[in-house]
């Protein structure tokens, strides 16, 4: 965590909004996360603004009851997996003779961002420069980790972007702003939940694939050399597995799954576990070809709570080794959000402070000062 690294001791409220549940806690405090059933939000879209607003209020009031410090004025970070998310890669080149300076790097990042905004007309939820190349004085194009100070005729950068439809984001943002105002919370920020989780895991793991199985979809995030290499949205979620079980005659999938996998029972309501496992395996196998066998898989999402037997079943269906199961994601998500802010100057990540129309540098300075207690 940030405090253990000596990087600050600030606190912030973090809320993870999903289609099945909404979770929240105060990061940097030993506060047990509060979790409630979701409402008004399905498949990454707002379906009932009033209901979602009520649910967020219920969650925040629940957090305030278990956190003794008071939530008024705390910065709040919402993490969410939006529907209609588009993942793109974009490349730009600028002249940089005689050598690459910090100004060149800043200019090409801004060029990447502005080009994507102008072409796609969508909100940029996340952005990272994943590759730099220089054209050296011998006209050789070379990939480099950090181009600053190198002699080069030109600098090329490739960025990875997560884009969200403007209408989808604005509907969501208006609800969050109302909730923020009602509970007198501090500054507000929005991040992608799977990216935040992957960034939090980078502190403990190197190259890996994060398999984040949500209620209506699965997000597969590949991390290579500390950077995001892939981000895929797969049409498989808990609801699809539940529907498959219902089709097999299992009327209460939630209870049955919890009982069979967590308690390791042989029989539940006259259901043969092998029949249940066979149905789940068929659904999980649909995404097996999307996962590389070269890197360990980290498993997260609601099904991560079902215990060792589900992990074994998942490994069998995917043909991949599950190296870690994330049963408590809030710590990793909070760590990931913090890490992305601190790495901004190094890897090109640009956080999105959508609630305030101010400069990017101003947003970063605010987070460092107010959230993390770091003075320049």
Predicted regions and their residues:
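Extended hydrophobic-aromatic, low-complexity segments
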Residues: 222, 230-232, 242-245, 307-311, ...
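Adenine-nucleotide phosphate-binding core of ATP-dependent small-molecule kinases
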Residues: 248-251, 257-298, 303-304
